Amino acid sequence: AVMGGVALLVFPVADSIINFLWYSFLPAPDGGISECGTASTGACPRVYNPLALLLARLKVASLAGLIVALPVFVYQTYLFMRPGLYPNERRYYLAAVPTSLVLALVGVAFAYFLILPVIFVYFLNYSEGVAEIAFALTETFDLIILMMGLFALIFQIPLFIMLAIMMGVTTRKWLADRRLLFWFSFGGIAFLCSPDPTGMAPLLVALTMITLFELTLGLLRWTGR
């Protein structure tokens, strides 16, 4: 319900968000966005089916809803588990609600400022001198939205690990002893969830997941947990 409500609020301004995201990573026409559709330089979005723009708007609205809904989901899970939690476990879970939102925003920012620029620079240089890329709205925007949503979820890894350890579900040693299994699992998830045949996006996703996993274990070891 929360995700749907936020999506409805964002949908009317989705076109502005689409243009902002698109030209954050791809070159705009020399004469500005209004030059799209004419013979101009720049990576204007290409629409190859009548529903492409509508679906792009829905994806933007859904991403906003997902980010806001993450802490709500954590809180709803807390309400479900609350009768069986000890007082200290309840404190941990309540603290996780705002932390989840912060981590989701950090994940989106990480994708926006670091991951997506690297991916699109790689794409632009990949075929330079061989072919001119026509960036389709659907496929290109799917990648942008997927990376932002995926990194919002990926950055929950430290939170989930810490909650599991603090609540006695697992231990740092158990996770550390099986790190290679987690690494391979992260790699498999990255290649399944990242629609990039060049392999650049899955590689960056997998490296980020492994790094977050190891940094969390390092922090727990440093704090003596």
What is each stretch, according to the model?
Residues 1-225:
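Membrane topogenic/interface segments and analogous intrinsically disordered interaction regions
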